[in-house]
Swiss-Prot record:
It is an enzyme of class 2 (transferase). Residues 14-35 have a biased composition (Low complexity). E3 ubiquitin-protein ligase which functions in cell cycle retarding in conjunction with the UBC4 and UBC13/MMS2 complex, 2 E2 ubiquitin conjugating enzymes. Involved in nutritional control of the cell cycle. Required for proper spindle positioning, likely regulating septin ring deposition at the bud neck. Signal peptide: none annotated. It comes from Saccharomyces cerevisiae (strain YJM789) (Baker's yeast). The keyword Kinase does not apply. The gene is DMA2. This is E3 ubiquitin-protein ligase DMA2. PANTHER family: E3 UBIQUITIN-PROTEIN LIGASE DMA1-RELATED, E3 UBIQUITIN-PROTEIN LIGASE RNF8. GO terms for cellular component: cell division site; cytosol; ubiquitin ligase complex. Residues 1-56, 69-92 are annotated as: Disordered. Residues 295-358 form the FHA domain.
Amino acid sequence: MYTPIPANTPAPTAPTSSMTSNSSSASNANTTSSSGINPRNRASGTPSNERARPASGISSFLNTFGIRQNSQTASSSAAPDQRLFGTTPSNSHMSVAMESIDTAPQQQEPRLHHPIQMPLSAQFHVHRNYQLPISISLTAPTTTDHQQSSAHNFEGNNVGNVQESLNQRQPNGTNNTTTSIISMAPAATTRNIVGGADGSTIVNNSQEMYKNLRHLIYAANQPNGTEILHLDLPATSAEESNNMFNVDEVTLKQRKDKHGLFSIRLTPFIDSSSTTNQGLFFEPIIRKAGPGSQLVIGRYTERVRDAISKIPEQYHPVVFKSKVVSRTHGCFKVDSQGNWYIKDVKSSSGTFLNHQRLSPASSLSKDTPLRDGDILQLGMDFRGGTEEIYRCVRMRIELNRSWKLKANSFNKEALQRLQNLQKLTTGVEEEDCSICLCKIKPCQAIFISPCAHSWHFRCVRRLVMLSYPQFVCPNCRSSCDLEASFESSDEEDESDVESEGDQLVDQLSVLMETSKDVDSHP
């Protein structure tokens, strides 16, 4: 390594001890190997070589600790110093030679200049607008060949390797995802799926039809949403079929959300009249999908967890932590008119719609239409349902945003009366929940304490249950008894009479005072 020395600095003296000479000789060898200087230039005995000895000693000292200086940085920084301090042309020529020699091995062994390539699903996951369509196989074996799957128009996604592809849009804006789908299943079970519906066309292998049921979520502009499903509807009357498929534009628009997707909401069904257990409890599930989509219903496993962790929750399959639910129990389907269907895919414990089984064990069922408010049950209790993992799943179905309550004049007036009550009691009009700091709006579950403070019930529920029946207001710290008995009707009548009597006394006192004032003035 070459380090320039200013002109006003005295040149270093020759070494006077054997220790110094030994260290300098060792440092020369290290300098030759580290900086890449030609040994022939070192043997020329120029003064620049002698000036480089102190710097080479520093480099040898650093090499003893495993620290290697960057020769390219030192050489690039040495050139300006040479121009500043007026070094000789020979020294400047040496610095150029050092740079050229140092850059040569770097070109032979280039460093990694590009970041680590993430899977395609991980790249899209960081964006808020997730790209559709999505295809996931919950039972296919794991593959690691990302490049092979990305060559297709619509990649086959496996557990642990979820690959999504962008919608190939033509210049006119249409979606070009209705081409053939090549599944990533093993070669022994190769399938040709036309139109994007899994299991629609299978050549000479009907038993493998739904063995690898795929979870398909299409975008809102998916054409031919009803045709690609290949629905196998039960025998119904002509009037029912016309009402199902002939939907006006106003109704169709109401079924879609702001992104043009249809939705389904599943909530636990609790039957208070039942003497047995109430089934598996789960949080409300909301899924959104475009026309022609197919949502898999199955069991939650580690493979499923790895697959769904890479996509947003609203596009997840419907999975439950219950062993009475098969790995691929069934599927939901939605057509272009927003009609939803349920299909049992050879489940062992069965699927029950409004307490009626769709198909026998290990057999396919028809695509049964769903209606808002239907009760769906997956499986039957095993071992009496004593353990939660062996309980069936009962749920209520709500379709296409029907659970969204619309605020009417009555709801708005009730909220306004509540706000006026708070203003009269506390003197301050509170519009926000003091726990979540969100506004209290109509059609929301609200808890009102005796001190006239209010919160969202889901926000204050833990405080209510913590010391029930006693409740301490988190706003004013007043305590009350939530189990206090109501006043009887007789006591209410007496209180009303007393209040009316007090009002009459007040009015009489006011009249007497006014009469005295009139008499005092002539």
